Amino acid sequence: MGAQFSKTAAKGEAAAEKPGEAVAASPSKANGQENGHVKVNGDASPAAAEAGKEEVQANGSAPAEETGKEEAASSEPASEKEAAEAESTEPASPAEGEASPKTEEGATPSSSSETPKKKKKRFSFKKSFKLSGFSFKKNKKEAGEGAESEGGAAAAAEGGKEEAAAAAPEAAGGEEGKAAAEEASAAAAGSREAAKEEAGDSQEAKSDEAAPEKATGEEAPAAEEQQQQQQQEKAAEEAGAAATSEAGSGEQEAAPAEEPAAARQEAPSESSPEGPAEPAE
C-alpha cells in the first residue's frame, strides 16, 4: 500500500512538472515551431534561417531539459520505492529481532530444562527425603514392590505356562471326547435304525396276524348267519310238518267217523229186505 501511494504521489508530481514544461515550451512554439517543425513565414533570408536554427537549437535543448526532469521524476519514485522497501525491511528486521530472542529463549530453555532435571534428581524417590519432619525411604519400599511385582509376573508367567500345558491335554482330551461322542452318536443312530427296522418287522408281523383274525372274525358272522338261516328253515319245516300232522290227524278222525256212519247205513240196507228199516237213531 505504501508503494502504491508513493507511485500516485510521483505521478502527481510528474503531472505538476509537465504543465510547467509545457508553459516553458510554449514560447518556442509561439515563435513558429510546432512539434519540432520550423514554420517559415515567407522569410527566406539567411538571417531568418539562422534565427530559425537558433530557435531550433533552443527548442532542441528544451527536450533535453524535459528528459532530465523526467529522469529526476522517475528517480524520485524510485527513491520513494526504495524508502518503502526500507520501511518494509525495517519491520522485518524487528521480526527477525523477535525471532532471534525466541531462538535465544528456545536455546535457554534447554539450560532451564536441565535445571528442573537437577531439581527432580533432588526430589527423586530413590533418595530419602523429609516431608514435614517425617523421613520416607522409598528405596526399600520400591525394591520390595519391584521384587513383588517381578515375583508376581514370574508367577503369572508360570501360571500361564501351566494353564497352557493343562489346556493342551484338555484340548486333546476334548478332541478325543468329541471323537468318542461322534462314535457314540453314530452307534446310537445305528441302534435307532435297527430299532426302527425291528419295530417295522414287528408291525408287519402284527398286521399279518391281524389280517387272519379279521378274516376269521368276518367268517364267524357269516357262519352265524348261515346257522340262523338253517334254524329258521328247520323251524319252518317243523311248523309245516306239524301242520301236516295235524291235518293228517283230522283226516284220520274224520275217517273213523265216516266208517260208523257207513256201517250204519249198510246195516239198514242189509236188513231192509228182511224187514222194515229201523229208524235211525
UniProtKB/Swiss-Prot annotation:
N-myristoyl glycine lipid attachment residues = G2
Give a yes or no for keyword Transport in this entry: no
Bias-annotated ranges (Low complexity): 89-98, 182-192, 218-281
Per the UniProt entry, the disulfide pairs are none
- Region annotation (Calmodulin-binding (PSD)) maps to 117-141
How is this protein situated with respect to the membrane? Lipid-anchor
* Primary site of residence: cytoplasm
Q: Which UniProt keywords apply?
A: Actin-binding, Calmodulin-binding, Cytoplasm, Cytoskeleton, Lipoprotein, Membrane, Myristate
GO biological process entries: actin filament organization; central nervous system development
User: Cellular component terms, GO, for this chain's entry?
Assistant: actin filament bundle; cytoplasm; plasma membrane
One GO MF term: calmodulin binding
Q: Where is the composition biased (Basic and acidic residues)?
A: 66-84, 193-217
What the entry lists under PROSITE patterns is as follows: MARCKS_1, MARCKS_2
Checking InterPro entries in the record gives: MARCKS (IPR002101)
Provide the leader sequence positions: none
Family of this protein: Belongs to the MARCKS family.
* Function description: MARCKS is the most prominent cellular substrate for protein kinase C. This protein binds calmodulin, actin, and synapsin. MARCKS is a filamentous (F) actin cross-linking protein.
Instruction: Output this protein's name.
Output: Myristoylated alanine-rich C-kinase substrate
State the organism named in the record: Gallus gallus
